[in-house]
Each structure stands twice: as C-alpha cells, then as structure tokens.
Amino acid sequence: MSTSRTAEITRNTNETQIRVAINIDGTGQQKLNTGVPFLDHMLDQIARHGLIDLDIEAKGDLHIDAHHTVEDVGITLGQAFAKAIGDKKGIRRYGHSYVPLDEALSRVVIDFSGRPGLEFHVPFTRSMIGAFDVDLTREFFQGFVNHALVSMHIDNLRGANAHHQCETVFKAFGRALRMAIELDPRSAGTIPSTKGSL
C-alpha cells in the first residue's frame, strides 16, 4: 500500500480531553483507557472485529456522569476515520453485518456517503448495564456518524440480555466498518459514486 491510512486526533474541551489514534489497515490491536470500563469493552469489539488498530485515551467529567466522555469519544473517533479514509478512492463504501450472541441478534449497515444520518433502533431490555447508561450507546454512534460523515442503520433484531444486545451492535459495527473501508482492487482507485466525489 502506497499511503498509510492512519490518523491521530486530539479533542480538548472544558468537559473532556481525548486522543484517538487509528490504523484502519491494522490487525485489531488496541490500547483503550477512557475511564468508562464498559465503553472500553465495546471499543475493543470494534478493534477486534474491524481489524482496526485503536489507541484511545480519554479524561472526562466522570464525577458528573459518563455522557460527555462517551459522546466525545464517538465524535473524535469519527473525525479520525474521516481523516484516515481521506478522499475515499478505492473503498467499497458500503458495509453491513449481522452478529448473533446467544439470544441476541443485531444488524448494522453503513454508507460512507459524506452525508451524516443515523437510524438507531435498539430496544434495550434494561436502562443500565452495570454502571453504564444504555442511552449513551446512541450518543456514541450519533457523535461518530456526524463526524465520520456516514449514513448508518443500527437494528437490534432480538435480544433479552441488554449486555448481549449492546455487544452485538458493536461487533456488527466493527464488521460493517471493515467491509466498507476495505480497498477494492477492482475499483482501480476510483471514488465509488457517480458524482465523482463523496
């Protein structure tokens, strides 16, 4: 590969200080320290199932709650993806995945369209997974979508265990990302759009 598809983004606000480094042609290596253990567990799923190297450090106002940290990690990760992918020449653009975990099944479909949009349909069976507020799952993905400039549909098709529901969503997200950002050797470096740009 002639150019490295990597990026490092730093985001500093009064609420959070975040650094994200990614290699989207990686092997799934990860170094995660967000201060939110369940978020680290979910980010690990993205790295492993997307074969994306992730190095994420975050310090946030966790004395209030995890909202700003989770949302801002999503924002910064989205910015890093946008930078690493660049002009999108040669990528497959679309990705999708179904992932089961015992009784739970989730589907994620993504389009690196340049137009942000999120359809999020996850009927969590409880409001908390340990100390993690399940509402923050949507906040993470909304932040990612808005800053990676992607259209994404996330559906939990069935599930009784909220941890399983959330984990299948993140695993499917990782696998859908992997498909969408993969370089297609047959496209000869063209942009996958009739408009000529994304």
UniProtKB/Swiss-Prot annotation:
S-S bridge residues: none
Parts forming coiled coils: none
Gene Ontology CC: cytoplasm
Pathway, per record: Amino-acid biosynthesis; L-histidine biosynthesis; L-histidine from 5-phospho-alpha-D-ribose 1-diphosphate: step 6/9
Catalytic activity: D-erythro-1-(imidazol-4-yl)glycerol 3-phosphate = 3-(imidazol-4-yl)-2-oxopropyl phosphate + H2O
Short name of any one Pfam family annotated for the protein: IGPD
UniProt keywords, alphabetically: Amino-acid biosynthesis, Cytoplasm, Histidine biosynthesis, Lyase
One GO term of the biological process aspect: L-histidine biosynthetic process
Protein name: Imidazoleglycerol-phosphate dehydratase
Organism: Herminiimonas arsenicoxydans
Name of the gene this protein is made from: hisB
